[in-house]
Every structure is written in C-alpha cells, then in structure tokens.
Amino acid sequence: MPASENRPSLAVALATTADSVAAWLDGAIACSGAPGARLSAAMRHATLAGGKRLRPFLVIESAALFGVPSHAAMPAAAALECIHCYSLVHDDLPAMDNDDMRRGRPTVHRAYDEATAILAGDGLLTLAFEILADDATDADPAVRLALVASLARAAGVAGMIGGQMLDLAAEGRFAEGAAHGVPLDLPADSIIELQAMKTGALLRHACEAGALLGRASPPERASLDRYARAVGRAFQIADDLLDVEGEAGLVGKAVGKDAAAGKATLVGKLGIEGARAELARLVSEAEAALADFGSAATLLVEAAYFIADRRN
C-alpha cells in the first residue's frame, strides 16, 4: 500500500521507532557495579540486539491516531518491549525451546549462563512495570493503572505465559508414561486459542496501550482491538511459515524446529497454501477494522501487510 503523502514510509517509521526504543532502553538499563554489572549487561544483550520493535511501533502508531506524540508514548512502548524481550530470554532456555541463536547472535544463556539469563528476564519483567508506574508515562494515575493492568493481563496466565504453557502441553511435555513427549493433535480452534494467548495478547495490549494514552472512546478501542486480534493471528501464521520456509541466516534463529518438536501450528493443520489463504484473509480483516480512522491509520494498515510478507 502507498504511504500517505504527509507521513513517512513504513520502513522509515519502523526504523525510527527501533532507534528511539533502543536509545530509550539504553538509558533505562544502566550498567551498575558488580554483581549488577553482569546482570545489566545480560539485560542489555537481550534488549539492544536489534529487532523490528513491532510491538512498540503499534503502541506509538495507535496513540498517534489520537494525537499523542511519539515521545509521549515511548515509555509505554519501551515497557512492552521489556516484556517481549524477557519472554524471548526465557523461551530460549534449555528447559523451554533450547535455542542457541536469537537475532543473529548467541542467546542470553549462551552468551552468559542460564542463571544470569533467568535473572535478566526477571529484571526486564519488573522493569516494565516500574516504567509504567512512573508519572513520566502519563500524568493521570488512572491511565497508568489501566496500562499496568492491561500489560499484566496480556503477559500473564490468561495471555502470553498461559499460551506458552498450553504450547508445552501440546508437545506432550507433561504427559506420563508412553504418552510423554508425544505431540497432541490439536484441532484448529485450539491452535488459534493457544496462539491468541501466546502471541496475540501482547499485540492486543500494544494497541490498547495507544488507545489508553489517547483517551480513545469505547468504539475506537474496539476497532483497534479487532485490528490487533487479526494482526496477532497473522503474525503467528507468518512466523510459522518462516519456520517451514525461511533461511536461518535471514530469520536470525534456527528454523525447522516447530515440526521437529511437533508444535501445533496452523501451517501444520492447514498446509502451506491454506495457511497463506488464511493469512491474506486476516490482513484484509485488519485493514477493514481501521476503516473509520481513514488515512490516519495508513501506517497501521501497512504494518499488517508487512507482517504477512516478512522474511525475518
């Protein structure tokens, strides 16, 4: 889709957001004296290694729909990125996905050690809520409270963490006897629910955070939520397709691991062509959800197409 004449292209907007978030986190994660220096270094390794910064971008662009400048949305955006990065640190651990590479370089537990990686993830998790509680995030304590509650729900048992637990259960991790390690044959509806929790919840929070900062009306918040739900599902399908078709050097992490682990994915259930058709439908659904915002939502609409077409 063409960018609005008065707004930057999506590539420029994503790059600007990525640079701004990195600079903000660089200042927020201070290097302290030993033993804090090792912990801070591990937290910085997790957060300053690049990445698309898609979640902060969604916070900033959702807030922009209501006239909130990017610098005012940055604390909420950075807090969400802390949660995302913490989840990656813990997901990469041997007890979870056992990955050696992330964003083209060693994962935190490989660069440091498992104990430091666990604590670095914990540090990022708690830093996120420290950021949201600060009055620099928003002058209105009610808005800060709403942001904290929204992120806690999205990252917690009803969201990301619960989705990860369902994912592990689907791999047969908790079964006993001969069933241990045997993947479950989940129906498509169960896979969608799992992915909505594991991946979609944080993306929904991103748009909700922007709406909260912008004092959006209930109908406006509902429109953004419909967009985020569709984008969340599209993101996971695209991610699963990358695991099947991607190249490790481009993706920045190992590929082919989902099938090897017997992970439940819509690509496995629908096949590649069926998954691509569902991906196209979800992008159209995301675009339709933002129709009432007109050209102000151009970058958010472009982001949906970008998510579907990404190569890393």
How does the language model describe each region?
Residues M1-A30:
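N-terminal amphipathic/basic leader segments beginning at the initiator methionine
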Residues S20, I29, G33-A288, S295-A308:
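Mg2+-dependent prenyl diphosphate-binding active-site environment of isoprenoid biosynthetic enzymes
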